[in-house]
């Protein structure tokens, strides 16, 4: 329910962002975050969880079956994204999105939009999400895995109770924004700067990209 933006502009120094960063640093300093987690590749993180070396991870549904196949004896569940104590509002659900668009210079715009409409149709979108083990883009679509698998059903219930949240979608040079934030974040974790300094430096870097 919180944001790194305000009126479409960077707002990294607000109290909510600071609180989240401080919480992560507290966990890092306490040694409860897997060593090297901030520089691991996605698959490395999944393997850490699959092999029982970490007790929790934030991940995609796409890996559920991979985890089951790699370690059939691992018993795990899915829960909503963590929130601060006392928070009662809707919870944002981080997601990786793929977009569909029609080029301005397309000679078949009408046909292209017809295809997009077909893919987003309730029944077709349900089929696509079932094949991909992912959440549908059409809010009325219900993928097959909801009725076939208790774990996926729990995940879908969480999805319906919250809202998709990815503040980097649609932002200018999103990868540069993530990289500049991570660079300052790593320096803060190593003790080279305070949380306030880290957020101020990241804010300055972001503002330059928004000009």
Regions found by a protein language model. Name each.
Residues 79, 130-183, 187:
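Long, aromatic- and glycine/proline-rich binding clefts that accommodate carbohydrate-like moieties
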Residues 29-32, 69-132, 183, 193, ...:
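Extracytoplasmic/periplasmic substrate-recognition and gating elements
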Residues 51-59, 72-74:
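Alpha-to-beta junction loops
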Residues 187-200:
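Short, charged, surface-exposed loops that flank catalytic or proteolytic processing sites
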Residues 37-50:
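Short helix-initiation/N-cap motifs at beta->coil->alpha
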Residues 1-7, 21, 29, 89, ...:
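Periplasmic solute-binding protein
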Residues 42, 59-64, 82, 96-98:
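Beta->alpha turn/N-cap motifs
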Residues 9-38:
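Glycine-centered hinge/linker elements that transmit conformational signals in sensory
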């Amino acid at each position: 329910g919180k944001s790194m933006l305000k009126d479409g502009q960077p707002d990294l120094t607000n109290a909510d962002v600071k609180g989240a960063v401080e919480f992560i640093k507290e966990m890092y300093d306490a040694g409860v975050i897997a060593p090297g987690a901030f520089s691991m590749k996605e698959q490395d993180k999944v393997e850490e969880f699959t092999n029982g070396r970490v007790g929790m991870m934030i991940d995609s549904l796409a890996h559920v079956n991979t985890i089951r196949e790699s370690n059939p004896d691992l018993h795990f569940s899915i829960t909503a994204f963590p929130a601060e104590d006392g928070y009662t509002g809707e919870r944002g659900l981080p997601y990786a999105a793929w977009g569909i668009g029609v080029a301005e210079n397309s000679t078949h715009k009408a046909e292209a939009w017809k295809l997009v409409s077909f893919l987003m149709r309730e029944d077709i979108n349900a089929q696509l999400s079932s094949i991909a083990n992912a959440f549908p883009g059409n809010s009325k679509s219900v993928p097959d895995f909801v009725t076939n698998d208790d774990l996926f059903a729990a995940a879908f219930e969480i999805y319906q109770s919250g809202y998709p949240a990815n503040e980097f979608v649609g932002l200018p040079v999103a990868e540069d924004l993530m990289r500049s934030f991570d660079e300052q974040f790593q320096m803060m974790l190593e003790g080279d700067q305070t949380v306030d300094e880290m957020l101020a430096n990241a804010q300055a870097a972001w503002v330059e990209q928004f000009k």
